[in-house]
Amino acid sequence: MSNIIKQLEQEQLKQNLPSFRPGDTLEVKVWVVEGSKRRLQAFEGVVIAIRNRGLHSAFTLRKVSNGVGVERVFQTHSPIVDSITVKRKGAVRQAKLYYLRERSGKSARIKERLGD
């Protein structure tokens, strides 16, 4: 029984995902339904957490919009997520960057990772 579930989950995994790590700046394009219309909405932010669980993998993006911190959790293999683009690679030494929630301005900056 579990082999059937694993096979079904394997078929639903997205194959064309870029590799990204915490600290990277991503642009995620998501399908949004407004009434009868369907359009793409872009969300650009810094990866502060990644949860690797196969089909149930997720990542959290954080951005500051009009002085307010906005965090959004995306399911990596969701059909709602249209595309993921890496805009900038960040050099950090932690897996979870929750400390960025308390920081603002220059202290919230992340150095760029070079040569990678």
Swiss-Prot record:
<dbReference type="InterPro" id="IPR001857">
    <property type="entry name" value="Ribosomal_bL19"/>
</dbReference>
<comment type="similarity">
    <text>Belongs to the bacterial ribosomal protein bL19 family.</text>
</comment>
<dbReference type="GO" id="GO:0003735">
    <property type="term" value="F:structural constituent of ribosome"/>
</dbReference>
<dbReference type="InterPro" id="IPR038657">
    <property type="entry name" value="Ribosomal_bL19_sf"/>
</dbReference>
<comment type="function">
    <text>This protein is located at the 30S-50S ribosomal subunit interface and may play a role in the structure and function of the aminoacyl-tRNA binding site.</text>
</comment>
<dbReference type="GO" id="GO:0022625">
    <property type="term" value="C:cytosolic large ribosomal subunit"/>
</dbReference>
<protein>
    <recommendedName>
        <fullName>Large ribosomal subunit protein bL19</fullName>
    </recommendedName>
</protein>
<dbReference type="InterPro" id="IPR008991">
    <property type="entry name" value="Translation_prot_SH3-like_sf"/>
</dbReference>
<keyword id="KW-0689">Ribosomal protein</keyword>
<dbReference type="GO" id="GO:0006412">
    <property type="term" value="P:translation"/>
</dbReference>
<dbReference type="Pfam" id="PF01245">
    <property type="entry name" value="Ribosomal_L19"/>
</dbReference>
<dbReference type="InterPro" id="IPR018257">
    <property type="entry name" value="Ribosomal_bL19_CS"/>
</dbReference>
<keyword id="KW-0687">Ribonucleoprotein</keyword>
